[in-house]
From Swiss-Prot:
Coiled coil: none annotated. It comes from Gyps rueppelli (Rueppell's griffon). The gene is HBAD. CDD domains: Hb-alpha-like. GO terms for biological process: hydrogen peroxide catabolic process. The lineage of its organism: Eukaryota, Metazoa, Chordata, Craniata, Vertebrata. This is Hemoglobin subunit alpha-D/D'. Heme b binds at residues 58, 87.
Amino acid sequence: MLTADDKKLIQTTWDKVQGHQEDFGAEALQRMFITYPQTKTYFPHFDLSPGSDQVRGHGKKVVNALGNAVKSMDNLSQALSELSNLHAYNLRVDPVNFKLLSQCFQVVLAVHLGKEYTPEVHSAFDKFLSAVAAVLAEKYR
């Protein structure tokens, strides 16, 4: 459960992500593809080379979706319902992959935010991204 302090930290930190959605998203995806190569199977039609337009475009979509979730922290299920349907019923993505991408996104935040990515911010984002992953996996049950 996100506390009021967690939500404030997430919103304040998210302001620093603004303007970098494509870069941060592409970097998180690249980290995931390298660290967890099995995740590439969900992108057979993509050019997965670093910096490709497809990876950058999808990275931007991912981070923008997270931005919408940040705006809707009190109602994640409604905010992410369409994405949950898409990933569960159309794309059939194994829900474990949401956790893998979350981990990679946290690394990207830590790299780019440096000392501003405090243990408290890390904890808040861990809770938030876990909640997002859980909501995205709801339709699999």
